[in-house]
């Protein structure tokens, strides 16, 4: 059972790691859409922001399935967006760290929902692409039991539920997978070393098989040892085990009756 448990633990670790890579690949695809959208915004930034340019930005955001809005800022001021009237869904323009990614908490948005921001900056122009929390949570939703995947950007994290949180000190999710394309990490909890549920769920069939093999081996060994024993040994063993109670016939002298 101990050996089977260790094997199932290694198997669970491999599954959790594969799930984290799958989630990271999902986030990479979303950010690839954001990167492509910024190229359209770069071309528009060199023109005027009129209805045609806004229509192009809106079309670009609509055709990318995971994007919400595209915002062009010049000298820190909103210059053009993909929404009518140059509206934005941000209550304030956040300050980005050195990375081009930022997790914005619900307090920074108009609809009070957290978002992921992708930034592209050149000269005095900044292009922001917003990605909704639903798409991020959908990318983190890997159908594996017992594991929870969380997106980490710098010191901020967002999971399948809840708002953006800042890491302070120790966090129980010690396993991680880094993206090779963008500055984010998928962190997740390791599988427990021993899990009775995992042993039953994944190893029940193996346990039954081991039990059947053990019973068959015991039966064959018993048949082998009993077959090689002499009749006298079999009789003596049966008497010692109480399986046979000997009956002693008294000896009678024929002449004396």
Task: Please annotate each region the language model reported.
Residues 33-87:
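Extracytoplasmic/periplasmic sensory segments of membrane signal-transduction proteins
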Residues 111-145, 150-154, 189:
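Conserved beta-strands of PAS-like sensory domains
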Residues 124-134, 175-202:
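Short, hydrophobic beta-strand elements of compact beta-sandwich sensory domains
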Residues 230-257:
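Active-site core of bacterial EAL-family cyclic-dinucleotide phosphodiesterase domains
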Residues 61-75, 141-157:
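Short N-terminal helix-loop-first-beta-strand/juxtamembrane motif that initiates sensory/input modules
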Residues 1-49:
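Juxtamembrane extracytoplasmic/periplasmic/luminal helical "stalk" adjacent to the first N-terminal
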Residues 197-233:
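Cytoplasm-proximal transmembrane signaling helix
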């Amino acid at each position: 059972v101990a050996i089977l448990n260790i094997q199932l633990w290694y198997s669970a670790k491999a599954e959790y790691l594969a799930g984290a890579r799958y989630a990271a690949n999902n986030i990479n695809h979303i950010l690839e859409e954001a990167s492509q959208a910024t190229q359209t915004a770069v071309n528009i930034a060199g023109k005027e922001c009129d209805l045609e340019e806004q229509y192009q930005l809106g079309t670009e955001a609509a055709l990318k399935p995971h994007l919400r809005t595209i915002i062009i800022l010049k000298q820190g001021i909103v210059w053009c967006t993909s929404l009518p009237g140059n509206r934005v869904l941000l209550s304030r323009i956040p300050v980005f760290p050195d990375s081009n990614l930022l997790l914005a908490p619900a307090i920074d948005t108009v609809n009070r929902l957290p978002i992921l921001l992708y930034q592209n900056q050149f000269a005095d122009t900044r292009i922001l692409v917003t990605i909704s929390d639903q798409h991020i949570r959908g990318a983190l939703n890997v159908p594996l039991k017992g594991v929870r995947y969380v997106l980490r950007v710098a010191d901020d994290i967002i999971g399948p539920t809840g708002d953006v949180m800042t890491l302070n000190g120790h966090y129980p999710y010690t396993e991680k997978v880094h993206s090779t394309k963008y500055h984010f990490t998928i962190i997740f909890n390791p599988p427990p070393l021993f899990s009775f549920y995992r042993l039953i769920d994944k190893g029940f069939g193996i346990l039954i098989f081991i039990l059947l093999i053990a019973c068959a081996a015991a039966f064959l060994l018993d048949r082998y040892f009993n077959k090689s024993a002499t009749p006298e040994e079999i009789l003596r063993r049966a008497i010692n085990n109480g399986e046979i109670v000997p009956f002693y016939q008294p000896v009678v002298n024929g002449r004396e009756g």
